[in-house]
Amino acid sequence: MHPKRRLCWCLPASGAWAFMLTSLIADTTACESEERLFHKLFSRYNQFIRPVENVSDPVTVHFELAITQLTNVDEVNQIMETNLWLRHIWNDYKLRRDPREYDGIEFVRVPADKIWKPDIVLYNNAVGDFQVEGKTKALLRYDGMITWTPPAIFKSSCPMDITFFPFDHQNCSLKFGSWTYDKAKIDLLIIGSKVDMNEFWENSEWEIVDASGYKHDIKYNCCEEIYTDITYSFYIRRLPMFYTINLIIPCLFISFLTVLVFYLPSDCGEKVTLCISVLLSLTVFLLVITETIPSTSLVIPLVGEYLLFTMIFVTLSIVITVFVLNIHYRTPTTHTMPKWVKTVFLSLLPKVLLMQRPLEQEKKNISKKTKKGSAKTSGKSKHSKHKDNKLHKEQRCCHCDKADDLTSTRRSRLSHQSLKWMAEHTEYSPEVKDVINNVQFIAENMKSQNETKEVEDDWKYVAMVIDRVFLWVFIILCVFGTAGLFIQPLIADT
């Protein structure tokens, strides 16, 4: 190989080896510097002693809360589970150094169990450890400033009011403070007035409306010292879409099905069947959604009140339907209609409810036609009476020879004289008398049947009026009862 080409190939290779060797030496130097730094910082360090130069001075701890997830809200056990990051910032004078002595190293990550930490705990913790585990590392700056941000999952106790479930709001708090150090030893300062929600994952059931923090100085009965705590209040609102679609709307439909019971005619025989079917469907529905409703005896939730209202609604409709059917099938042989029933249910309420019987309308039309025709026939009344008398005399003389004429002419006189009077005061053959008696029996029987049918129709009409009354009553109760129940959360918010 040519010497010049060999030299050109060797120069880049030697440069790469030189760069790698320099980097290795630099890394080795940095590792040695960091090792010297750790040895210098922790060789005589005691993590159990408060990092203050003067014993009377407090350690100022800056505290901030960041929430990443609202995991669960247990209404029955009154527990709120959250995933949090707790940021602690304080200064430890014993860990200060000059970065120039250690190759410019300004930040080091140190195990949290090797340094002193403020014993900040969650006062209202319900399940698990009250204190944060020190398995994460802390960031140590050259001037002794320590930033420690451990993650934690807390299950905090939260008194809950589910009166307006599922349109309820809850106010849950997290109270942090030192468990053993009073304000003279540790002074907590809050960073900002709000919870950091930059890394928050939205919850499918709850929405955080507001999350504010406050500092409190409290003197407890057990001790004379004043203790400092920082309390974060989470004002959360339940998203009611799931319960509205799967709980409230089906109950609303069941309520309106109950209203339709009173629109169903009594003659169809399906009124009680429809009522029982609605009641059974509501019962099955309640068994399905029992686990969805918070099981508590402290208060009755709003949706529980609505379900109870619907159950009473359906049960009452069954009772009223049985009563209406009892009235519908009454007859003159079993019941006598009182006068007040006729006045109220046959005259007064139908006018109020804008109901009108077809027979009454026909009677009105006939009476109008009669009044119009009475004026035309008044002038011919005397002539007709004279003609009837003459015809009567002729029939008495020749009643045997003109039997056919007797039948045709007496049709007009049946409305003026009874058949009984005719049979007693007129001499007829036995055959004619039998015919008259039979006709009289048939007429009386038909009259009795017509009277019975009129009374039965009156009872049926009374039942129809009662149905119409309760139809409007149940519509009003259903609309205003439903609106009144679900307007309560809006009124409570205002």
Curated annotation (Swiss-Prot):
Keyword line: Cell membrane, Disulfide bond, Glycoprotein, Ion channel, Ion transport, Ligand-gated ion channel, Membrane, Receptor, Signal, Synapse, Transmembrane, Transmembrane helix, Transport
Disulfide bonds: 158-172
Signal peptide extent: 1-31
GO cellular component: acetylcholine-gated channel complex; dopaminergic synapse; neuron projection; plasma membrane; postsynaptic membrane; presynaptic membrane; synapse
Reaction(s) catalysed by this chain's protein: K(+)(in) = K(+)(out); Na(+)(in) = Na(+)(out); Ca(2+)(in) = Ca(2+)(out)
Membrane spanning stretches: 241-265, 272-290, 306-327, 469-489
Function: Component of neuronal acetylcholine receptors (nAChRs) that function as pentameric, ligand-gated cation channels with high calcium permeability among other activities. nAChRs are excitatory neurotrasnmitter receptors formed by a collection of nAChR subunits known to mediate synaptic transmission in the nervous system and the neuromuscular junction. Each nAchR subunit confers differential attributes to channel properties, including activation, deactivation and desensitization kinetics, pH sensitivity, cation permeability, and binding to allosteric modulators.
Family membership: Belongs to the ligand-gated ion channel (TC 1.A.9) family. Acetylcholine receptor (TC 1.A.9.1) subfamily. Alpha-6/CHRNA6 sub-subfamily.
NCBIfam families tied to this protein: LIC (TIGR00860)
Protein name: Neuronal acetylcholine receptor subunit alpha-6
Organism annotation: Gallus gallus
Recorded name of the encoding gene: CHRNA6
